Amino acid sequence: MGIRCSTWLRWPLSPQLLLLLLLCPTGSRAQDEDGDYEELMLALPSQEDSLVDEASHVATATFRRCSKEAWRLPGTYVVVLMEETQRLQVEQTAHRLQTWAARRGYVIKVLHVFYDLFPGFLVKMSSDLLGLALKLPHVEYIEEDSLVFAQSIPWNLERIIPAWQQTEEDSSPDGSSQVEVYLLDTSIQSGHREIEGRVTITDFNSVPEEDGTRFHRQASKCDSHGTHLAGVVSGRDAGVAKGTSLHSLRVLNCQGKGTVSGTLIGLEFIRKSQLIQPSGPLVVLLPLAGGYSRILNTACQRLARTGVVLVAAAGNFRDDACLYSPASAPEVITVGATNAQDQPVTLGTLGTNFGRCVDLFAPGKDIIGASSDCSTCYMSQSGTSQAAAHVAGIVAMMLNRDPALTLAELRQRLILFSTKDVINMAWFPEDQRVLTPNRVATLPPSTQETGGQLLCRTVWSAHSGPTRTATATARCAPEEELLSCSSFSRSGRRRGDRIEAIGGQQVCKALNAFGGEGVYAVARCCLLPRVNCSIHNTPAARAGPQTPVHCHQKDHVLTGCSFHWEVENLRAQQQPLLRSRHQPGQCVGHQEASVHASCCHAPGLECKIKEHGIAGPAEQVTVACEAGWTLTGCNVLPGASLPLGAYSVDNVCVARIRDAGRADRTSEEATVAAAICCRSRPSAKASWVHQ
């Protein structure tokens, strides 16, 4: 499941139709299907406009739409222009499309023009004009509008806020907060006792009509979802971040349905508010989900670049969250839902989404919160919307303590201090268990109590696909440093992994092999102040038994090892050794492999290797870094018949091998998981710890 892309072609305009259009009065007005009128200007084509009529002109833009047919909204399209397009060019492009359409007897309506979040415009038009629109100058792609949905069907506060922290107040002495949360949802009953005086109802309203001619808009029902979530975020009694200010933007109708375009306009509204009246830290809660949308993910990325923290529901479809937006946006903190037993939420035949796009889970089952039935009523709701609201509240509390925290720091701290290994992973599909995080959110302690700790997380790539030349790429956030790269293949057929530069950013790339079923790249992404990293490469030695590489720059320490094979040789394939017996602190690989050492320098950075081996049959071996140390690199050392790969799970290195239950295995053939553990002590010098 994903997006389908296609390029549309239009047919040449007939001479008779062209003559008819030219005979029409220049200032005539056309009526669209909604009964609204729009000024259309018909004129002889200019030399520039006539270029589009050349048969040789081929559209370079692409057309995208939701993979779920029932969620599509044909006839409404977001025309996305190149990132560097200027405001005047956006207006000219929209006007040109109107002009070209009018010559062909079509009326289109420009519903909204985007300037502040991305260059583009929302247009209502016939699908017959898509081929024409794709040939417009500056157009990067066109995305058909689609639906998004609300994701909902006092143990929760006890779970995410430890008892010793519940007595602390995270707001200022007068009970206020400098953090503002924007909620994109249904309307809200702002007079409820839980949130009274804390909610600002904006004049923003961008929702589709409700389905069904007999639908009755009951105010309390229309406000239900938004009121409940507002109470979860900042309610007086049932809220997480008590005292936090909320701004309500209505993007979901009374049935809990909205559109991608309405959500985009809502995000741009927030950006405009930022520009007009800069304020303190902003958190945007997106308790909704629709099919994968490139433009919605891009809009989230652009808003995140301005310092806004976005928190999104993973979705309630018991499916891979990467297939939905905004959950799949890398710049969004994506939240799945658990119940009171810290297990994945089941909602009838569906349940919480999962997979590599989920950052962590939070309470999302039978959550007590404000009800819109009356100003003192309460009700329970379930879903990943409620889970996302909990994390939005936690983020607001963290920012209220330390407004300077960035998105990368917030995410890393949420991961570090989450409750780990409590979820029964058997609930998830087998192929998703290794990708899905086993973490439930809790409120982290203040930064003063944990300052200086090296923070790292694991980022998985999408699956590469099965072709022999297929690759997979995992990327860190711009603020993070890529300290190591590894790979994993369920078939074991892979040509290794390496760190390389793409578009000015270091990325982790994994290579599939002939006969392989695909591969994952696994990046270890860390926050390390004043770090300077470089990759040292050694090509295949060929003549010698091993290929060694080490950190030769002064004060640089080894944080990761990787290798790759230029020529496939599965019989000889082995992971790189992290050291030889006489020379610790270097990567040593097979003579036919190119070996890469990730070497970094930062004030007080010190690293060491920790190993654990099993001589008998084993499908996986693990080794963990001690308290105070952070895992930066993970490898499986030779000994297994065929290693499937290695990856980091929080602070644990996991080495996976194909079932190697041979009775004649010896201790020298033990499968070994090797972890590189580092810590940052700013007062000390960078060093390698010999063990």
Swiss-Prot record:
Protein name: Proprotein convertase subtilisin/kexin type 9
Peptidase S8 domain boundaries: 154-441
Main location: cytoplasm
Molecular function in Gene Ontology: apolipoprotein binding; apolipoprotein receptor binding; low-density lipoprotein particle binding; low-density lipoprotein particle receptor binding; serine-type endopeptidase activity; signaling receptor inhibitor activity; sodium channel inhibitor activity; very-low-density lipoprotein particle binding
Top EC category: hydrolase
Residues the UniProt record annotates as site (Cleavage): Q151, S152, R217, Q218
GO CC terms, sorted: cell surface; COPII-coated ER to Golgi transport vesicle; cytoplasm; early endosome; endoplasmic reticulum; extracellular region; extracellular space; Golgi apparatus
Gene3D superfamilies recorded: Peptidase S8 propeptide/proteinase inhibitor I9, Peptidase S8/S53 domain, Proprotein convertase subtilisin/kexin type 9
Sulfotyrosine sites (modified residues): Y37
Organism superkingdom: Eukaryota
Active-site residues, record numbering mapped to chain: D185, H225, S385
Propeptide span(s): 31-151
Modified residues (Phosphoserine): S46, S687
Organism: Rattus norvegicus (Rat)
Cysteine disulfide links: C222-C254, C322-C357, C456-C526, C476-C525, C485-C508, C533-C600, C551-C599, C561-C587, C607-C678, C625-C677, C634-C653
Effect of S152V: Abolishes autocleavage
Sequence motif: Cell attachment site, positions: 495-497
Cofactor or coenzyme needed: Ca(2+)
Oligomer status and interactors: Monomer. Can self-associate to form dimers and higher multimers which may have increased LDLR degrading activity. The precursor protein but not the mature protein may form multimers. Interacts with APOB, VLDLR, LRP8/APOER2 and BACE1. The full-length immature form (pro-PCSK9) interacts with SCNN1A, SCNN1B and SCNN1G. The pro-PCSK9 form (via C-terminal domain) interacts with LDLR. Interacts (via the C-terminal domain) with ANXA2 (via repeat Annexin 1); the interaction inhibits the degradation of LDLR.
Record flagged with keyword Transferase: no
Stored Pfam families: Inhibitor_I9 (PF05922), PCSK9_C1 (PF18459), PCSK9_C2 (PF18464), PCSK9_C3 (PF18463), Peptidase_S8 (PF00082)
Keyword Cytoplasm (UniProt): yes
Domain notes: The C-terminal domain (CRD) is essential for the LDLR-binding and degrading activities.
